[in-house]
Amino acid sequence: MIFKYPGGKTYETKQMNKSIRPFQPNYGNRGMTLEEDLNATNEYYREHGIAVIHKKPTPVQIVRVDYPKRSAAVIKEAYFKQASTTDYNGVYRGKYIDFEAKETKNKTSFPLKNFHEHQIHHMQQVLRHGGICFVILRFTTLNEVYLLDANHLIMFWEQQRSGGRKSIPKREIERYGHYIALGYQPRIDYISVVEKVYFSH
């Protein structure tokens, strides 16, 4: 089955364009993407009754379907559609949680081009209705992860629209954001930061 991105580029798995290497565990960051680490973290939270947070499925537009049998359909071609909201949502201590997760190889700033207008609009709506909304930002080269409240992201977004910087300086993320310590279980314990930032008043 062929998957294509909105721009028409064909989706390739790592196995399609790289030779398969034997698994070598790396307990520093375990070689995982931010998404994989967060999915494992959320599974840990659910299993231990801490929070119920899920990743929203990526919307797919089906283009071509074959029917080899009357009772069975086979998808032959589909496109990943651009997500209209954020990556994750759920409930913690009776409050609605909604957040986006992004990573960059940059060491000194986080590019705002990683976010889209519709995501910012969605975050504004969540905040308007009293939900907890934030972004989790990973500097992959430094292996550092931060939680930044959506209000601050929106502030930098508005500054960009007014002719300001097209990225958030790391020093500003350190100033307004909250460092998330990395561990084994859970890998990225962002709920402990959520507890401190949003519930310890």
UniProtKB/Swiss-Prot annotation:
EC number assigned by the record: 3.1.21.10
Family annotation (SUPFAM superfamilies): Restriction endonuclease-like
Pfam families: RecU
Cofactor: Mg(2+)
EC category name: hydrolase
GO molecular function: endonuclease activity; magnesium ion binding; nucleic acid binding
Binding site for Mg(2+): 85, 87, 100, 119
Reaction catalyzed: Endonucleolytic cleavage at a junction such as a reciprocal single-stranded crossover between two homologous DNA duplexes (Holliday junction)
GO cellular component: cytoplasm
Feature type site, description Transition state stabilizer: 102
Highest taxon of source: Bacteria
Subcellular location: Cytoplasm
Record keywords: Cytoplasm, DNA damage, DNA recombination, DNA repair, Endonuclease, Hydrolase, Magnesium, Metal-binding, Nuclease
Role played: Endonuclease that resolves Holliday junction intermediates in genetic recombination. Cleaves mobile four-strand junctions by introducing symmetrical nicks in paired strands. Promotes annealing of linear ssDNA with homologous dsDNA. Required for DNA repair, homologous recombination and chromosome segregation.
Family classification: Belongs to the RecU family.
Listed name of the protein: Holliday junction resolvase RecU
Gene: recU
